[in-house]
Regions:
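Residues that cap or delimit alpha-helices
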Residues: 10-13, 102-103
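Hydrophobic core segments within long, regular secondary-structure runs in both alpha-
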Residues: 3-6, 46, 88-91, 95
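Acidic/histidine-rich alpha-helical segments that form the ligand environment
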Residues: 70-111, 121-136
Length: 166
């Protein structure tokens, strides 16, 4: 569903905000734009699939680490093509992680400083990860539907495709 929303988004909506932030909001306004929400979703999917601590993780180029430092923003909106390539890479990473998942890896404790010292297992982190992707895919799909994007582009996806774009 995330891929459907990404592919279906027309150029005029790519930099539109899904919500308006209050003037005292601490995050830059682009954090509410379609392209950024897509990036945000993929960034966290990638990080959580790695199970790595943040200091051991870096998103692939051209992406930068903006999520925990709102003062650092991308110099430009990422393109649909860049984000589609990132989506394809994270899908491959997801497949690899799931097919290689062992009981030991599933139980491995994962901690992040922003999680307020609430360590979780790698498997629980992946369940959270799935909910997070689903939440933002639904937001993006709703936004597109509100802007009269044809329903066929936003159909429910009952099962993952074998390959992105297929």
């Amino acid at each position: 569903m995330l891929e459907n929303a990404l592919v279906a988004c027309p150029a005029p909506l790519w930099t539109q905000r899904l919500w308006s932030a209050p003037s005292d909001h601490s995050l830059p306004p682009e954090f509410a734009e379609f392209w950024y929400i897509t990036y945000h979703t993929l960034f966290w999917l990638d990080l959580y699939l790695s199970g790595s601590r943040e200091e051991e993780f870096a998103p692939p180029a051209p992406f930068i680490w903006t999520e925990l430092d709102p003062a650092v923003s991308p110099e430009r909106p990422y393109t649909k093509e860049e984000l589609h390539a990132y989506l394809a890479a994270t899908r491959q990473k997801c497949d690899a992680q799931l097919f290689a998942l062992t009981d030991e890896r599933a139980r491995q404790v994962v901690e992040y400083p922003w999680a307020e010292e609430q360590a979780v297992s790698f498997l629980e982190l992946q369940l959270y990860n799935m909910r997070h992707v689903q939440e933002h895919a639904a937001q993006l799909s709703l936004f597109l539907g509100q802007h009269a994007i044809p329903d066929a582009a936003l159909d429910w996806v009952p099962r993952a495709k074998d390959e992105p774009g297929s």
